[in-house]
């Protein structure tokens, strides 16, 4: 398949963001550079209130549907979304797609102490060589400390990585990438992928395939981590249906659109 031209790519407008209407295979074949963000319901709610997060989305080269629920609701639009591409499973697809590419060098940034290193070990064992060239678990609140952020930039640069996965939660990971991307010229692909490092390390289990297939992975995760996720899924994310209903009725207004 020929590389897709950005100006020829189809986009689906959901609330105030444009989502690339792309399949997993198309993304694998065309993700050569840029920032990848993966909107889900939680992101879409934050994007109604957080201008900095919204600006990051506008500057990101790849905006891909992460949510099965968003994918299903997208069927109500004139041009439905082709495929939901959960970031956690996409990353596995990405390194397996590039497993024979000696030029693909990945750095993992995120998760709790020791987990990123464990993920690095497992991935390298799976692909049979040192594809992941570095891993680091930053301190809690690291993004508020410029000296630590600059040290992280130095570590990534010295690793020789050209792919950086940041998994410290949204919107922190997306904002951090956009703030520091220009200081890491060797990195061509930036991925903001939440709990992916934990999944790769085996410290967090993905939902069984049947739960994923029917769009209920979010419920499975909530059952596993109710204290952390109940409010997000059953209170905060419910706002999406209000906003999406307004879009279907043609009365939704982008809170950040210039007058």
Language model region names:
Residues 77-159:
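Conserved beta-alpha
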Residues 138-143, 186-224:
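Short, flexible loop segments at boundaries between secondary-structure elements
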Residues 33, 102-104, 185-189:
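A short helix->loop->beta-strand "cap" motif at the edges of active sites that frequently abuts
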Residues 69-76, 206-259:
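A transmembrane-helix-recognition feature enriched in membrane-embedded lipid enzymes
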Residues 1-92:
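N-terminal nucleotide/polyanion-binding subdomain common to many enzyme families
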Residues 70-72, 172, 196-201:
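Short gly/pro/ser/thr-enriched loop/turn and capping motifs at secondary-structure boundaries
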Residues 120, 174-183:
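Short Gly/Thr/Asp-enriched flexible loops that form oxyanion-binding sites at enzyme active sites
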Residues 156-165, 169-170:
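Proline-aspartate-enriched helix->loop->beta-strand connector
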């Amino acid at each position: 398949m020929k590389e897709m031209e950005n100006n020829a790519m189809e986009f689906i407008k959901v609330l105030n963001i444009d989502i690339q209407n792309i399949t997993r295979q198309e993304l694998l074949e065309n993700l050569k550079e840029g920032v990848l963000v993966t909107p889900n319901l939680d992101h879409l709610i934050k994007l109604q209130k957080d201008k900095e997060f919204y600006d990051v989305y506008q500057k990101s080269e790849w905006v891909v549907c992460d949510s099965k629920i968003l994918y299903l609701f997208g069927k109500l639009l004139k041009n439905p979304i082709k495929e939901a591409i959960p970031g956690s499973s996409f990353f596995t697809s990405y390194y397996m797609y590039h497993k024979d590419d000696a030029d693909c060098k990945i750095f993992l940034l995120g998760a709790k102490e020791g987990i990123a290193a464990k993920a690095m070990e497992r991935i390298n064992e799976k692909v049979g060589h040192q594809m992941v060239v570095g891993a680091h678990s930053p301190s809690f609140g690291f993004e508020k400390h410029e000296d630590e952020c600059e040290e992280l930039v130095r570590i990534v640069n010295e690793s020789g990585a050209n792919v950086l996965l940041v998994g410290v939660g949204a919107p922190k990971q997306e904002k951090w990438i956009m703030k520091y991307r220009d200081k890491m010229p060797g990195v061509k692909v930036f991925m903001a992928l939440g709990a992916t490092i934990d999944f790769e390390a085996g410290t967090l289990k993905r939902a069984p395939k049947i739960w994923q297939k029917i769009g209920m992975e979010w419920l499975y995760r909530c059952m596993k981590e109710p204290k952390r996720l109940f409010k997000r899924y059953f209170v905060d994310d419910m706002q999406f249906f209000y906003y999406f209903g307004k879009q279907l009725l043609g009365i939704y207004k982008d809170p950040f659109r210039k007058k």
